[in-house]
């Protein structure tokens, strides 16, 4: 072999071998244990960045490791290809989104191949292609038929810049997650899917995911937001526009006797009815429409409101309280109305302070300590005071008593509530899957029949940056059903629809149905999913929901899509996330040209544990490159020294035994690091230590010495093969192995090699270490005592003293007490 490491040549040869042998194309094989490894597919933005490289290196390392353990491994790749950035890029570059997208996927596929990722490209899915979205459309029509998809006029988050609806999760600090424009509230007809029907199961089944990060499960639990509370009726003193009252939901019925006013959301029907004759209220409602609805913002923003002048009756006392419209009340949680208890809710307290409303204490600390309501609300649970017959009750007793009073008076009931809202899937954009619905002349709707799917999105369009080309195309909108003129729905699906089921389509990408159940049930669930924690709520919750919908359609059998989840950290440079705007990006292509793909892979796995952020350093990349050159050189010089035979374990000297022990200790550690712990950085460090040991203590003067070195170098090659596959492919061949390293079995630990003939024990005199001694590993207490008492350093420290006792801890120490 060439004594110098030449990555470009080595990597081209390995990639050619994998391509010619279709090394990563797999089929179902019931005789083998399957392993489905998946990294979140990329948006085809045009070029890979270091975040992609890290993400896909992790999944590739895991895939190759499990393959070497004899499993049937599926590791597919595709493109999350619909979405707004393609529209924006098309406008900017004066091209069609489809053309821009396909040219990007071609370029990025080449980049992924150059990095040596072992993807089964025969299963590639591209979500903007009709053979993919046809089945999404078909599935939506099935959901519609089951009553799980519906249309209603809804108040939505509207991005005036992107001219589209945003999910609550896509509003960050009151701004669009994509373009940072201030988000407004707007009412338009929208399509929804009833994710709330599955809220209970989505919550409960998080307990079936022991191999998910606790943080992700907590985020989902909080997002689903199950709570137990009381729904109660506040009657209006005088009816408004035919409405006699409104419902309020609270998790704190124990504070009901402290209600001093009630607040309605700006979008509440009563508020809207009053606004028709109240210009000040109408203006205030308009102002509320452009404020953030993100929880964090609502907690911190200035609380504002307007007194409607009408009164509502307290459901227990019958006392009249004023009705306000307030900017901190959300229409889509509970019922869009809250009972205000300023003494025991901080938002109500801030509002009451601003508008000089009564603050009435009804809860006192259980320990009898004082509270100061002039400074802030007392929000903890405690004991009821100033609450008539309920005084002295704690939270649980008050919850029970007050809810029973309300129930008996037909004014309320105990209910379970969820923060989770139904998923709004309509988008007023062009580059997405058309929603498969016909709008009828009478205003009704009907799903497009299955034999007329897919509803094709025209790809050869001109983008004007103002209106969706399909909305503007009157011919496209026109259709006919049973001789009647109908119109195509011009909204498209939220792109989270595509990413909610792509993992399942990979199992049968060419099926003439949504999934082939036999293939899907062989491969699913995904055994290992890899992706960023920023997808904890949206994508991961929607995918879990979609999986349950597919299960209930009889397409899959398992309850959950992803068995184990690894959320990789970000790639930083100069302490901040790499981004074009900050000018701190590193181009993977330049690195591959300079150092080769293996160096890039090695550095990105070695620099930090996978869940932590990785700080990019040029010196770290140089270090990874140096290590590969050192490994290459070690193998080349070993092979030059002659051919190695079998190890004769019975005639090894101490040095050879030590190197063998180090080899098998490394195999044991690295196997655990790859499999159970998934700490690839410590696996690499262990192989580096082994290589240091080889260069330090290899003995080529005897056949046994050469054989022990060969075993160590072959082990190092196998252990690094998942991380630096090109170099290891070439090294494994150089050792004369017929089978490619990709298909070589993972090395096993020889337990006999781990056994030590001798051990080091500590000799102490009066508790102070005086010597470190070698002793036979099987020496008993008497033998260890004799060895310690024969050592010169020990003798020197007990000379002239009387030995009172000798304490022996086998395998560790001998302590002589003398005075």
Curated annotation (Swiss-Prot):
Gene Ontology molecular-function annotations: aminoacyl-tRNA deacylase activity; ATP binding; leucine-tRNA ligase activity
Motif ('HIGH' region): 42-52
Motif 'KMSKS' region positions after renumbering to this chain: 577-581
GO biological process: leucyl-tRNA aminoacylation
Keywords tagged on the record: Aminoacyl-tRNA synthetase, ATP-binding, Cytoplasm, Ligase, Nucleotide-binding, Protein biosynthesis
Reaction catalysed by this enzyme: tRNA(Leu) + L-leucine + ATP = L-leucyl-tRNA(Leu) + AMP + diphosphate
GO cellular component: cytosol
Ligand binding (ATP): 580
Entry EC number(s): 6.1.1.4
Pfam families: Anticodon_1, tRNA-synt_1, tRNA-synt_1_2, tRNA-synt_1g
Compartments (UniProt record): Cytoplasm
Family per record: Belongs to the class-I aminoacyl-tRNA synthetase family.
Entry-linked HAMAP family: Leu_tRNA_synth_B
Protein name, UniProt field: Leucine--tRNA ligase
Gene designation per UniProt: leuS
């Amino acid at each position: 072999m060439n004594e110098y490491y030449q990555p470009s040549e080595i990597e081209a040869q390995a990639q050619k071998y994998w391509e010619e042998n279709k090394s990563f194309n797999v089929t179902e094989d019931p005789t083998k244990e399957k392993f489905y490894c998946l990294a979140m597919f990329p948006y085809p933005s045009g070029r890979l960045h270091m975040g992609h490289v890290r993400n896909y290196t992790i999944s590739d390392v895991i895939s190759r490791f499990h393959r070497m353990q004899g499993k049937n491994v599926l590791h597919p790749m595709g493109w999350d290809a619909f979405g707004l950035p393609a529209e924006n890029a098309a406008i900017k570059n004066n091209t069609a989104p489809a053309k821009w997208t396909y040219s990007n996927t071609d370029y990025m596929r080449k980049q992924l191949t150059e990095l040596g990722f072992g993807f089964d490209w025969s299963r590639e899915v591209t979500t903007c292609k009709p053979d993919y979205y046809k089945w999404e459309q078909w599935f939506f029509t099935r959901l519609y038929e089951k009553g799980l998809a519906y249309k209603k006029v809804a108040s939505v988050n509207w991005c005036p810049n992107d001219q589209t609806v945003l999910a609550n999760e896509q509003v960050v600090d009151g701004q669009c997650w994509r373009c940072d424009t201030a988000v407004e509230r707007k009412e338009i007809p929208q399509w929804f899917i009833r994710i709330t029907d599955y809220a209970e199961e989505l919550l409960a089944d998080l307990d079936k995911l022991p191999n998910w990060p606790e943080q992700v499960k907590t985020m989902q639990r909080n997002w689903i937001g199950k709570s137990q509370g009381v729904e109660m009726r506040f009657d209006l003193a005088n009816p408004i526009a035919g409405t006699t009252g409104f419902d309020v939901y609270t998790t704190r019925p124990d504070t009901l006797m402290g209600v001093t006013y009630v607040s309605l959301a700006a979008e509440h029907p009563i508020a809207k009815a009053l606004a028709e004759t109240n210009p000040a209220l109408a203006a205030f409602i308009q102002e509320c429409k452009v404020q953030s609805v993100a929880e964090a913002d609502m907690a911190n923003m200035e609380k504002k409101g307007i007194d409607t002048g009408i009164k509502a009756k307290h459901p227990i006392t019958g006392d009249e309280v004023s009705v306000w419209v307030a900017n901190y009340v959300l229409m889509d949680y509970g019922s869009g109305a809250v009972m205000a208890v300023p003494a025991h809710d901080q938002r109500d307290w801030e509002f009451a302070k601003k508008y000089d409303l009564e603050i009435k204490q009804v809860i006192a600390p259980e320990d009898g300590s004082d509270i100061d309501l002039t400074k802030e609300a007392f929000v903890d649970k405690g004991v009821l005071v100033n609450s008539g017959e309920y005084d002295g009750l704690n939270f649980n007793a008050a919850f029970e008593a007050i809810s029973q009073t309300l129930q008996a008076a037909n004014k309320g009931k105990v209910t379970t509530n969820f923060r989770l809202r139904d998923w709004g899937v309509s988008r007023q954009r062009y580059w997405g899957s058309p929603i498969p619905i016909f709008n009828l002349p009478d205003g009704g709707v009907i799903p497009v029949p299955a034999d007329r799917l897919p509803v094709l999105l025209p790809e050869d369009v001109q983008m004007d940056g103002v209106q969706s080309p399909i909305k503007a195309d009157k011919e496209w909108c026109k259709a006919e059903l049973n001789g009647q003129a109908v119109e195509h729905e011009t909204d498209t699906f939220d792109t989270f629809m595509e990413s909610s089921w792509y993992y399942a389509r990979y199992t049968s990408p060419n099926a003439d149905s949504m999934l082939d159940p036999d293939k899907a049930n062989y491969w699913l669930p995904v055994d290992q999913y890899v992706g960023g924690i920023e997808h904890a709520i949206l994508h991961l919750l929607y995918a879990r929901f979609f999986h349950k919908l597919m299960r209930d359609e009889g397409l899959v059998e398992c309850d959950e899509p992803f068995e184990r989840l690894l959320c990789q950290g970000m790639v930083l440079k100069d302490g901040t996330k790499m981004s074009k705007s900050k000018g701190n990006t590193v181009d993977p292509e330049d690195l591959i040209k300079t150092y080769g793909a293996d160096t890039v892979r090695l550095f990105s796995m070695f620099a930090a544990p996978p869940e932590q952020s990785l700080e990019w350093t040029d010196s770290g990349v140089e270090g990874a490159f140096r290590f590969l050159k050192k490994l290459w050189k070690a193998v080349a010089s070993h092979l030059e020294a002659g051919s190695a035979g079998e190890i004769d374990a019975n005639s090894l000297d101490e040095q050879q035994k030590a190197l063998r022990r180090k080899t098998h200790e490394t195999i044991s550690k690295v196997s655990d690091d790859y499999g159970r712990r998934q700490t690839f950085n410590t696996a690499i460090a262990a192989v580096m230590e082994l290589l240091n040991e080889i260069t330090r203590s290899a003995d080529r003067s005897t056949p046994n010495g050469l054989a022990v070195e060969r075993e160590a170098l072959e082990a190092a090659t196998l252990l690094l093969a998942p991380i630096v596959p090109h170099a290891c492919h070439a090294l494994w061949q150089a050792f004369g192995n017929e089978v490619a390293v990709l298909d070589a079995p993972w090395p096993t630990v020889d337990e006999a090699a781990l056994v030590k003939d001798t051990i080091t024990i500590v000799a102490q005199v009066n508790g102070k270490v005086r010597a470190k001694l070698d002793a036979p590993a099987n020496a008993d207490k008497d033998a260890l005592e004799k060895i310690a008492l024969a050592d010169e350093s020990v003798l020197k420290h007990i000379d002239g003293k009387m030995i009172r006792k000798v304490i022996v801890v086998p395998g560790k120490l001998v302590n002589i007490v003398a005075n």
